[in-house]
Structures are given as C-alpha cells and as structure tokens.
A protein has these predicted regions:
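Tubulin/FtsZ superfamily GTPase core signature
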Residues: 1-178
Length: 178
C-alpha cells in the first residue's frame, strides 16, 4: 500500500489517505471487514461531496474551483472534514467535528499552510458564530497560511450549521519525492 501511495503522490497535487490499520483502531477488530471498508468509503464520499459542493454551489461568500486549486495544488497530504451541529454551541461543535476525523492518516493539523473553509447555514448564522469558526481555524493553521472562507446561505436550513474544511500543506506530511 505504501508503495502505491508513494507512486501516486508524484501525480497528484493533494492526497487523502485512510490507512487500513485505522479501520480496526476506530471500529474495533470484531467489526465486519466489509462494514469497516463501507465506513471508510463514507468518509471518502463525504470528502468528494464536500469538495463538489464547494465548487458548484454559489454562496453568499463564494468559493470556487480556483480557490480549491490554490489550497490544494502541490500541497502533499490533505485533510478534509465536515461537521454539522445545531443548538447553542453549534459553531464550536461543527468546526471541532470537521477538524477531527479519526480515520485519516495521523496528520497533525497544526501548521497547515492552506485551509479552505465552507460554512453552510440558514439565515440565522450569527457574526459571533462566524468568528468562532474563524478563530478555531486560525488556531490550527500556520501563521502565514492561505485561509479561504466561503459561506452558503440555505434559507430552508434554519437551525443547522455545517462546516467543511480542506487543510493542506503539512510540512511533516509532504512527499520528499519530486
């Protein structure tokens, strides 16, 4: 598997890796292998869906393919996460969930040099909630990081808040090969 990852890294700008060992660690050894792989596929499906929505849905603060390319081009390993929450602390809960995917390869998010954040909410998104999300992202990112934030307003989505994050450019995770 590592040989395949090494070969693939030379052809892609960014790479999301889910190690097989994480399946057992997260879901336990008594989980069906088929169920474990389906759970991993759900994570990858969510990543693809999140990136697709970022590119295709026009937002109040728009993020487009050029922004995704800016954050992902030539950046090595990537982390993609999404979190949804409602209630009093929904911003903190959604961004924390988005930043913590137990299946992803042991990537330390601190020091990311590229971060794309997309916030989806109803018209009830507050300035304080927007700031909570931005503050949490700035905590994990490199001080010189390129942080791009988008915001999609879904009028029929009152109460729920979704945060999708793509983080790249982890110095310790970048491939040393050309």
């Amino acid at each position: 598997a590592q040989e395949g990852i090494n070969n693939l890294e030379q052809w892609v700008d960014s790479l999301i890796v889910i190690p097989n060992s994480k399946l057992k660690e997260v879901y336990g050894g008594d989980e069906s292998i088929f169920s474990s792989f389906e759970n991993a596929n759900d994570v990858l499906r969510g990543a693809v869906k999140g990136i697709t929505e970022i590119i295709t849905i026009r937002g109040f603060m728009n993020v487009d393919f050029a922004d995704v390319k800016t954050v992902m081009s030539g950046m090595g390993k990537a982390m993609m996460g999404s979190g949804v929450s409602s209630g009093e602390n929904r911003a903190e809960e959604a961004v924390t969930t988005a930043l913590s995917s137990p299946l992803l390869d042991n990537i330390d998010l601190h020091g990311a040099s590229g971060v794309l954040v997309n916030i989806t909410s109803g018209s009830d998104l507050t300035t304080d909630e927007f700031e909570v999300i931005g503050s949490k992202i700035r905590e994990i990112a490199n001080e010189d990081a390129k942080i791009i934030t988008g915001c999609i307003k879904e009028d029929d989505n009152i109460g729920d808040l979704r945060v999708t994050i793509i983080a790249t450019g982890f110095a310790q995770s970048k491939s040393s090969e050309p």
